[in-house]
């Protein structure tokens, strides 16, 4: 499945907008995720964590991966910038807003807008964007309590797309609280038990090594539940 091109020089630098096809990545890292796509397409949810120290290019790699998945594999990709977030409710708000603003599948977007019509407002003058209204705790709490059902319903609207790939960029703040560890572990367990082979979805979390170790140890994940992809060297 590795049919994309890797170039000799990375054009990524702060403030430099480039074509994703020019990205120089670590081919083995990208392949370590892509090789699981057949499982995801069959409805088996997968969870990955990309670890590396600050400045290692984790965000750039996730951007490139998003491009590859959308362009070559008919996957919907959603990326959440999660820096500084330390609670699950804020994470869910950012996920819903990212879905509303970035999903290119009209039927899925319409379904989301219908479901959340009482909780959504538009902001901006040039290019309107959707956001969740400040007083929406009841909605966010209900999604947090039954996140597997939310994901299952999301996947039911894929139509001609093969899967959804959600990138949560930076879980370092969330790793500070046991509530996230417990919530995500419960989500992983229940998604598989309740909706086995019904949810073609994958998650990629990015983290510093020490924070991932804390989450893995506290959550007692097994090797089949979360796949760790170690990014030890920066891009050059």
Label for each model-derived stretch:
Residues 32-37, 65-66, 151-152, 184-191:
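Short, well-ordered amphipathic alpha-helices
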Residues 1-48, 68-71, 211:
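A short, basic N-terminal segment
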Residues 1-2, 15-18, 160-167, 171-236:
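The catalytic "switch" region of P-loop NTPases
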Residues 23-27, 85, 234:
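Short, solvent-exposed loop/helix junctions and linker helices
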Residues 44-180, 201:
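P-loop NTPase nucleotide-binding core
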